């Protein structure tokens, strides 16, 4: 159900994006006013504040975005750690069912064991697919808003930051962004129960490949955003893992609150 809701939200956002993009260049319309203008104003203000360094302005904006999203991210880690504690508690029963399921060839017996497994999940109130997609959904309009603010700002596009131009693709930044998100994807698995880790292993490769594919033909400002954001995500993951691994009772509070 959650996957369907997420897909619908993504489609709805795409409709808003397509209907608003034509007006962005003229700085009018709902899409520009809600998503692009805040970044347009922020980029110019911070660029002036840092002596014309729009690259540094993008770094600071990314840090601010990650700090705003941090409570949502930590809540997701908290929920995942709570699930992990419950999965550990039910592991002996789960492994016994899995062993019997592997040994039997009888279709009817397999159906019974699968139902028994579902009953075990229900008994312990565990949903192995409960990932928490809100932080991802929130980021979509943020990334697009920042991208269009840069796209229609000649000053930002012409700015030289470090060794590259913010308005042109840069292969080195593309590779750095991909490497950061590969490591971030691996680190993110640490907060998940073992069952979720198996389901999400492919994500380790899909995420950085998508980042590099988009960055390869986009302005270097985009992989700058992703690189800084990815590093901050890694730090947030370490914070969430350290706190909730050392305080499993706090993680379980999240699961109990959700029940109520």
Name each model feature, range by range.
Residues 2-4, 9-260:
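Helix-loop-helix
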């Amino acid at each position: 159900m959650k996957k369907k809701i997420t897909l619908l939200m993504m489609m709805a956002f795409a409709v808003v994006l397509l209907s608003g993009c034509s007006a962005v260049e003229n700085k009018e319309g709902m899409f520009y006013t809600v998503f692009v203008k805040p970044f347009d104003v922020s980029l110019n203000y911070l660029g002036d504040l840092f002596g014309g360094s729009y690259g540094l302005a993008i770094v600071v904006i990314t840090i601010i975005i990650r700090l705003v999203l941090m409570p949502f991210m930590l809540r997701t880690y908290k929920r995942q750690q709570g699930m992990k504690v419950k999965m550990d508690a039910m592991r002996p029963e789960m492994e016994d069912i899995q062993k019997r399921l592997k040994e039997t060839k009888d279709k009817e017996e397999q159906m019974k064991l699968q139902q028994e497994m579902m009953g075990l999940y229900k008994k312990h109130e565990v949903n192995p697919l409960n990932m928490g997609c809100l932080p991802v959904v929130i980021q979509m309009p943020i990334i697009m808003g920042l991208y269009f603010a840069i796209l229609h700002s000649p000053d930002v596009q012409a700015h030289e930051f470090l060794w590259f131009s913010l308005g042109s693709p840069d292969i080195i930044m593309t590779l750095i962004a991909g490497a950061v998100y590969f490591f971030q994807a691996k680190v993110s698995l640490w907060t998940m129960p073992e069952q979720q880790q198996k389901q999400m292993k492919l994500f380790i490769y899909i995420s950085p490949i998508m980042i590099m594919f988009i960055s390869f033909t986009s302005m270097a400002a985009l992989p700058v955003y992703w690189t800084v954001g990815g590093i901050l995500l890694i730090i947030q993951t370490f914070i969430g893992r350290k706190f909730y691994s050392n305080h499993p009772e706090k993680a379980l509070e999240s699961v109990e609150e959700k029940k109520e």
